[in-house]
Curated annotation (Swiss-Prot):
The lineage of its organism: Bacteria, Pseudomonadati, Pseudomonadota, Alphaproteobacteria, Hyphomicrobiales. This is RNA-binding protein Hfq. Belongs to the Hfq family. Transmembrane segments: none annotated. HAMAP family: Hfq. RNA chaperone that binds small regulatory RNA (sRNAs) and mRNAs to facilitate mRNA translational regulation in response to envelope stress, environmental stress and changes in metabolite concentrations. Also binds with high specificity to tRNAs. Contributes to long-term survival under nutrient deprivation, to stationary phase-dependent hydrogen peroxide and acid stress resistance and is required for prolonged survival in the intracellular environment of the host macrophage. The gene is hfq. It comes from Brucella abortus (strain 2308). GO terms for biological process: regulation of DNA-templated transcription; regulation of RNA stability; regulation of translation, ncRNA-mediated.
């Protein structure tokens, strides 16, 4: 049977969400955001920092840099 595969973007965002890894997100206009992903969908990422949430649209994101290595697959060393 064929398994349903997840795309890399969803695997990455779900991993950093579950592991509560702090991220730096650079937007296409140069703005730098930091925080922890609390949720995401096809269009946006909910970022939390200092008790405040920010809804960031994915089309505005240029780069995402985690503050530590991300383990995306079971048994994989980060």
């Amino acid at each position: 049977m064929a398994e349903r595969s997840q795309n890399l973007q969803d695997l990455f965002l779900n991993s950093v969400r579950k592991q509560k890894i702090s991220l730096t997100i650079f937007l296409i206009n140069g703005v730098k955001l930091t925080g922890i992903v609390t949720s995401f969908d096809n269009f946006c990422v909910l970022l939390r920092r200092d008790g405040h949430s920010q809804l960031v649209y994915k089309h505005a994101i240029s780069t995402i840099m985690p503050s530590q290595p991300v383990q995306m697959f079971e048994g994989e060393e980060a």
